[in-house]
């Protein structure tokens, strides 16, 4: 059941999509109340509107397959409440050194052979040092040479570091907002919200595409989920890739006992993301294994068109590749073939 914070509001105050769109066009931005109104639509109506937005912008209806590799695991000095890689938490994740170039390239070759379009490299750093950037740029060049799109998530970036990654050929840089600004401090204290926005600005200024999303189910209210999506949608331009994670509670972290978000509320979140960011790749990220096949199918109906693909994400499990391909085939969904980066204009 949905909690009191996620119960649908009376429909008397809900405006039509056309009215909402006019207000957005006039102001240039989505408001939290407008996005709350979308959340509160009858489920079938919300799904229909999301499908309309999806089909208008992705008529081919394909699903992008992205593989995520942890190139440097554990030992992070930050205190993100959801993350088992934080050194201060007693989890099963052990600190490891940065992977070598050949090991990364072997993983990228395996990902391409399995059908992935994009290869994402993640490192558990607060921010990379310049010597780290030199090593990662070699990885980027090697992965690009295989014909894969590249993405990296390395923590906060200075402008010169972002430029170095772009010059190496990096297509996307991931830096999530995680949640709404007012809920953020209850989850993280070691990195400010503005720090995240500054990194996104540095990525844009360097000429790379942005991958930016967050995590739902951390105890936030529906209003806070709406505020989170409003902030994403009002970035100019909004992110080309929007990963939406469903919290995976991990033993030893502060959110280990967090009550799961209602699955239908997660589907609503995907639908609202599609409507408010119609040209973005909306990616089902962590937590898919826990959601199961039926909810994932509903997420694809709601406009999700990208998944993290492969048995392991950074530190949490993921459906096996064969299971994903079988589900997509059963739903009649084809996978994205082109490796050309999509850029919003």
Swiss-Prot record:
Family: Belongs to the radical SAM superfamily. Biotin synthase family.
Principal EC category: transferase
EC number: 2.8.1.6
GO MF term set: 2 iron, 2 sulfur cluster binding; 4 iron, 4 sulfur cluster binding; biotin synthase activity; iron ion binding
Subunit structure as annotated in this protein's UniProt entry: Homodimer.
Cofactor(s) of this protein: [4Fe-4S] cluster; [2Fe-2S] cluster
Record domain Radical SAM core: where: 61-288
Job of this protein: Catalyzes the conversion of dethiobiotin (DTB) to biotin by the insertion of a sulfur atom into dethiobiotin via a radical-based mechanism.
Pfam families, A to Z: BATS, Radical_SAM
Binding site for [2Fe-2S] cluster: 120, 151, 211, 283
The protein's name in its UniProt record: Biotin synthase
Catalytic activity: (4R,5S)-dethiobiotin + (sulfur carrier)-SH + 2 reduced [2Fe-2S]-[ferredoxin] + 2 S-adenosyl-L-methionine = (sulfur carrier)-H + biotin + 2 5'-deoxyadenosine + 2 L-methionine + 2 oxidized [2Fe-2S]-[ferredoxin]
Cofactor note: Binds 1 [4Fe-4S] cluster. The cluster is coordinated with 3 cysteines and an exchangeable S-adenosyl-L-methionine. Binds 1 [2Fe-2S] cluster. The cluster is coordinated with 3 cysteines and 1 arginine.
Organism: Polynucleobacter asymbioticus (strain DSM 18221 / CIP 109841 / QLW-P1DMWA-1)
Protein keywords: 2Fe-2S, 4Fe-4S, Biotin biosynthesis, Iron, Iron-sulfur, Metal-binding, S-adenosyl-L-methionine, Transferase
Family matches, as InterPro entries: Aldolase_TIM, BATS_dom, Biotin_synth/BioAB, Biotin_synthase, Elp3/MiaA/NifB-like_rSAM, rSAM
Keyword Transferase: yes
Pathway participation: Cofactor biosynthesis; biotin biosynthesis; biotin from 7,8-diaminononanoate: step 2/2
One GO BP annotation of this record: biotin biosynthetic process
